[in-house]
Amino acid sequence: MKDLTAKQRSVLIFIEEFIEKNGYPPSVREIARRFRITPRGAQLHLVALEKKGYIERKNGKPRAMRVTKSVKNRVPLIGEIRAGEKKEAIEYLEDYIEVPGSFLSSGYEHFLLRVKGESMIEEHICDGDLVLIRRQDWAQNGDIVAAMVEGEVTLKKFFQRGEMVELRPANKEMSPMFFRADRVKILGKVVGVFRKYEGGRTCFLTR
């Protein structure tokens, strides 16, 4: 089966969640309203999902569709993030990894990043871990976030005081970074951590 675009993936997840809640699939117009697109745009997404093998539909029946391959709990691993100094943003699809549904917030997109560096070790986020990020453009003080500053990304604890933002490491040997708030873009909040131990064991550490 072919890879989905981000929008196609979001549409498919919406269809799955709609069916779980209502017992039947959404109409084209309901999909269009959810994503603020035209009915034709929604129809094109359904055609693409069908061609790629993720749904099946019956001609002439607006709600006659079923999901043939679930992606609801499969999260894209899209590169690495520096837990240390800022680093040029690296974003490319490496893989999809299935995570427990309890770690995923309904209505949000999620993605995984591989951690490089040791600036967050006091929060039990270590070099080589995979952090699960809930995509959002805001944060509360104390949240661990993936943040972009002038095209470079970093993983830090977020604190804002007036017009200044502090990106604070969880490592006593490293210093915090300070920026004007308008220079900092929040990419998302850390909601989980994957760690692979010797012997191939994988577990979640935090949420």
UniProtKB/Swiss-Prot annotation:
Enzyme nomenclature, EC number: 3.4.21.88
Xref: InterPro entries: LexA, LexA-like, LexA/Signal_pep-like_sf, LexA_DNA-bd_dom, LexA_repressor, Peptidase_S24_LexA, Peptidase_S24_S26A/B/C, WH-like_DNA-bd_sf
Active site: S119 (for autocatalytic cleavage activity), K156 (for autocatalytic cleavage activity)
UniProtKB keywords: Autocatalytic cleavage, DNA damage, DNA repair, DNA replication, DNA-binding, Hydrolase, Repressor, SOS response, Transcription, Transcription regulation
Site annotation Cleavage: residues: A83, G84
Keyword match Disulfide bond: no
Gene3D superfamilies cross-referenced by the UniProt entry: Umud Fragment, subunit A (2.10.109.10), Winged helix-like DNA-binding domain superfamily/Winged helix DNA-binding domain (1.10.10.10)
Keyword Transcription: yes
Annotated GO biological process: DNA repair; DNA replication; negative regulation of DNA-templated transcription; proteolysis; SOS response
Reactions the enzyme catalyzes: Hydrolysis of Ala-|-Gly bond in repressor LexA
Top-rank taxon, per record: Bacteria
Family matches, as Pfam families: LexA_DNA_bind (PF01726), Peptidase_S24 (PF00717)
GO molecular function terms listed in the Swiss-Prot or TrEMBL record: DNA binding; serine-type endopeptidase activity
Top-tier EC class: hydrolase
DNA-binding feature ranges: 28-47
Functional summary from the UniProt entry: Represses a number of genes involved in the response to DNA damage (SOS response), including recA and lexA. In the presence of single-stranded DNA, RecA interacts with LexA causing an autocatalytic cleavage which disrupts the DNA-binding part of LexA, leading to derepression of the SOS regulon and eventually DNA repair.
Similarity-based family: Belongs to the peptidase S24 family.
UniProt cross-references to NCBIfam families, sorted A to Z: lexA (TIGR00498)
Subunit record text: Homodimer.
Protein name: LexA repressor
Originating species: Thermotoga neapolitana (strain ATCC 49049 / DSM 4359 / NBRC 107923 / NS-E)
